């Protein structure tokens, strides 16, 4: 595993400039090397017995090349040609450091690393309002409604929601949307709009475009149906 600049190892605080690992990961993919996964500022490679010295040398050479491109602040069209071509209007004239700075600032503004920690600490877990099975049955019966992410706060999730990374369910059916989970998905929504081409994989939520902006939507239990299910102690 390698770490990229951006977080002070002494105190865990964001530095003024950083290199989000997803940018390095995309550069490596552009050049035939596929990392196993990457997080905010770390990237993981899996080595198998089949790997030979030539492949390791290729990886090292690409890392050195990326570092030189970063130092020279190379044009983004040279570093990530595929993403640049797909979103040329958005990234016209951009350099590598400029992209790194914008993405790093987004992470720092939302304190995304702290949100990731809180989502998996017991004291920050979403409050449970329904049995997951009951919530799933309500979903299958259509006793749900699709709402925008900001409107989901305080509502009961009808589906489990999973962002990759970290690739773990952050809210499960029957839990209340809110807290660190809602703020984390809100940060992802901003990133999807601000930095096209770097959208994370999301499951259990839905991306819809309205007036030129992509919005995150999710299914929640209809209030009266949820109350009825709880009061009756319905078993299916």
Where in this protein do the model-derived segments appear?
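Non-catalytic terminal extensions of PLP-dependent enzymes
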Residues: 1-236
């Amino acid at each position: 595993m390698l770490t990229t600049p951006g977080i002070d190892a002494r105190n865990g605080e964001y530095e003024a400039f950083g290199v989000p690992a997803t940018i390095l990961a995309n550069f490596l993919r552009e050049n035939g090397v596929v990392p196993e996964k990457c997080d905010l500022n770390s990237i993981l490679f899996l080595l198998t017995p089949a790997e030979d010295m030539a492949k390791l040398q290729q990886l090292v050479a690409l890392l050195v090349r990326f570092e030189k491109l970063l130092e020279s602040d190379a044009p983004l069209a040279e570093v990530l040609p595929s993403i640049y071509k797909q979103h040329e209007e958005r990234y016209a004239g951009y350099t590598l450091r400029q992209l790194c700075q914008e993405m790093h600032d987004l992470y720092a503004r939302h304190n995304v690393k702290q949100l990731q920690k809180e989502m998996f600490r017991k004291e920050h877990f979403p409050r449970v309002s329904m049995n997951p099975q009951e919530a799933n049955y309500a979903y299958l019966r259509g006793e749900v409604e699709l709402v925008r992410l900001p409107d989901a706060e305080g509502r009961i999730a009808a589906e489990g929601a999973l962002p990759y990374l970290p690739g773990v369910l952050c809210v499960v059916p029957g839990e209340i949307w809110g807290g660190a989970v809602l703020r984390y998905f809100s940060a992802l929504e901003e990133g999807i709009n601000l930095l096209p081409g770097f959208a994370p994989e999301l499951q259990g939520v839905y991306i819809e475009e309205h007036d030129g902006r992509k919005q995150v939507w999710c299914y929640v239990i209809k209030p009266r149906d949820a109350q009825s299910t709880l009061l009756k102690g319905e078993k299916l």
